[in-house]
């Protein structure tokens, strides 16, 4: 009888140990999956950040004022982004410039062989600030959501004026406007999650 009780106690202890080991293994797997999700999403965020930080728009506007008080003005873009985010940045700037006061939003999926796809929601505000929300395209319990924010430098335009220059020309004013983003104004943070009650 005592042997039966010991056998029963040993079985119960074994069941508890087996349950704890299974739970621990599941938790380790979930931690590994969450860590991999974070590494994938944060790598995508850093890749986008670095490309945008190397991008800029430079526009030059030349206003020629004549001696009869008339003037002409021409504008041209002398520099524009060339990296893999160039299409996003150009579309965002064009939309913001066209629809003054409205933000531009677009979503893409970033794919790299051997890694999970990352969904990125790009928003350019009317002041050219950029917010990109990134997460695993497949979602899931171990998903990691990060927010990349880049603030536009807000540099004043460079203005130079040359007087004279011709028989009918009074002065030529060149205004150079630069839109760019600085590492000092770039952050990557976890997205705040609001729980539903």
Please place each PLM-identified region on the residue numbering.
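Conserved functional hotspots that engage anionic ligands or polymers and/or phospholipid headgroups
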Residues: 1-2, 50-197
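Aliphatic-rich helix starts adjacent to a transmembrane/signal segment
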Residues: 5-39
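Membrane-proximal N-terminal amphipathic helix
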Residues: 26-58
């Amino acid at each position: 009888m005592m042997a039966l009780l010991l056998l029963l106690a040993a079985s119960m202890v074994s069941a508890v140990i087996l349950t704890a080991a299974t739970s621990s293994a599941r938790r380790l797997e979930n931690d590994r999956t969450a860590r991999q999700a974070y590494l994938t999403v944060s790598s995508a965020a850093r890749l986008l950040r670095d490309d945008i930080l190397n991008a800029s728009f430079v526009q030059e506007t030349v206003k020629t004022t004549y001696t009869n008080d008339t003037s002409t003005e021409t504008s041209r873009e002398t520099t524009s982004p060339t990296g893999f985010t160039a299409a996003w940045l150009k579309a965002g700037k064009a939309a913001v410039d066209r629809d003054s006061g409205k933000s531009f939003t677009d979503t893409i999926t970033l794919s790299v062989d051997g890694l999970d796809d990352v969904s990125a929601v790009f928003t350019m505000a009317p002041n050219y600030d950029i917010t990109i929300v990134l997460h695993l395209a497949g979602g899931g319990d171990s998903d990691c959501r990060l927010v990349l924010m880049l603030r536009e430098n807000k540099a004043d335009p460079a203005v130079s004026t040359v007087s004279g220059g011709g028989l009918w020309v009074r002065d030529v004013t060149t205004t150079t406007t630069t839109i760019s983003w600085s590492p000092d104004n770039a952050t990557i943070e976890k997205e705040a999650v609001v729980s539903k009650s």
